[in-house]
């Protein structure tokens, strides 16, 4: 009996080792789980479900094979793949969830999020995030020619890398006040999120009672998986080879 959580795999054609590691995880480690949650940034970027990139089909089929074995699959959008839609989710056998969302995990209410909502000190990014949530803008972008979307995504990734190189680590991390607010708002004592690439389990006090925040790791150097069982949460690392 276990529920699995992963995030920030950042799959792309340039890193076939990460794709192979994920496919291996889905085929050999995830079967038999009570559920698998992917908390965003499964892909390095996503410009629409109509992108014919063969990587997308390979990954969707690997998830679908797990779904067909009876493992429920859930996905929360990240800041890199916020345009991932129902067509891909249907092929992969996934259910799309909102951010944040609350689940019942072995009798405990847990709030899930990709995590970028919690980085409130990064005001520039939060402004950009609000813009990307505009439905009319998404509708317009997805109707651009595929080549145009690819060019825009490439330019935006370059700008993001340049900006992040000059930001402090504090600005790009979550703020305690935002964590506390989200927990209170959803009446939870536990939170699971990704985005910051700083895997850890943080225990703290919230309104005089114990609370826990679990941060998932990325898959750049090794796979990072959170394994939850009744009364237990454990972060594990998996080799990419």
UniProtKB/Swiss-Prot annotation:
Pfam family, one: Metallophos
Residue positions binding Mn(2+) 2: 41, 79, 114, 195
Catalytic activity field: UDP-2-N,3-O-bis[(3R)-3-hydroxytetradecanoyl]-alpha-D-glucosamine + H2O = 2-N,3-O-bis[(3R)-3-hydroxytetradecanoyl]-alpha-D-glucosaminyl 1-phosphate + UMP + 2 H(+)
Co-factor binding details: Binds 2 Mn(2+) ions per subunit in a binuclear metal center.
Alphabetical list of InterPro entries matching this protein: Calcineurin-like_PHP_ApaH (IPR004843), LpxH-like (IPR043461), Metallo-depent_PP-like (IPR029052), UDP-diacylglucosamine_Hdrlase (IPR010138)
Keyword Ubl conjugation in annotation: no
Subcellular location: Cell inner membrane
UniProt KW keywords: Cell inner membrane, Cell membrane, Hydrolase, Lipid A biosynthesis, Lipid biosynthesis, Lipid metabolism, Manganese, Membrane, Metal-binding
Membrane topology: Peripheral membrane protein
A Gene Ontology biological process term: lipid A biosynthetic process
Top EC class of this enzyme: hydrolase
Cofactor(s) listed: Mn(2+)
This protein's GO CC annotations: cytoplasm; extrinsic component of plasma membrane
Residues given in the record as Mn(2+) 1 binding sites: 8, 10, 41, 197
GO molecular function: manganese ion binding; UDP-2,3-diacylglucosamine hydrolase activity
Protein's pathway: Glycolipid biosynthesis; lipid IV(A) biosynthesis; lipid IV(A) from (3R)-3-hydroxytetradecanoyl-[acyl-carrier-protein] and UDP-N-acetyl-alpha-D-glucosamine: step 4/6
EC number: 3.6.1.54
Domain of life: Bacteria
Annotated positions binding substrate: 79-80, 122, 160, 164, 167, 195
Keyword Oxidoreductase among record annotations: no
Cited function: Hydrolyzes the pyrophosphate bond of UDP-2,3-diacylglucosamine to yield 2,3-diacylglucosamine 1-phosphate (lipid X) and UMP by catalyzing the attack of water at the alpha-P atom. Involved in the biosynthesis of lipid A, a phosphorylated glycolipid that anchors the lipopolysaccharide to the outer membrane of the cell.
Family assignment from sequence similarity: Belongs to the LpxH family.
NCBIfam families in UniProt: lipid_A_lpxH, PRK05340.1
Record protein name field: UDP-2,3-diacylglucosamine hydrolase
């Amino acid at each position: 009996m276990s529920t699995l959580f992963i995030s920030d795999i950042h799959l792309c054609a340039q890193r076939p080792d990460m794709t192979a590691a994920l496919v291996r995880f889905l085929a050999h480690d995830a079967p038999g789980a009570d559920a698998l949650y992917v908390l965003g940034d499964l892909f390095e970027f996503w410009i629409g479900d109509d992108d014919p990139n063969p990587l997308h089909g390979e990954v969707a089929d690997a998830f679908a094979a797990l779904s067909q074995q009876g493992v429920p699959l859930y996905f929360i959008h990240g800041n890199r793949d916020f345009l991932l839609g129902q067509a891909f989710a249907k092929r992969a056998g996934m259910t799309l969830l909102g951010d944040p969302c609350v689940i019942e995990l072995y009798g405990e209410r847990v709030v899930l999020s990709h995590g970028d909502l919690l980085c409130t000190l990064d005001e520039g990014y939060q402004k950009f995030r609000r813009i990307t949530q505009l439905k009319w803008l998404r509708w317009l972008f997805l109707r651009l020619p595929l080549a145009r979307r690819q060019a825009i995504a490439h330019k935006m990734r370059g700008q993001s890398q340049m900006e992040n190189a000059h930001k402090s680590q504090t600005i790009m991390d979550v703020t305690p006040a935002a964590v506390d607010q989200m927990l209170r708002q959803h009446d939870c004592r536990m939170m699971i999120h990704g985005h910051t690439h700083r895997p850890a389990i943080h225990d703290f006090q919230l309104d005089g009672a114990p609370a826990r925040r679990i941060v998932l790791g990325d898959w750049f150097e090794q796979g990072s998986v959170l394994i939850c069982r009744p009364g237990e949460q454990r972060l594990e690392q998996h080799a990419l080879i």
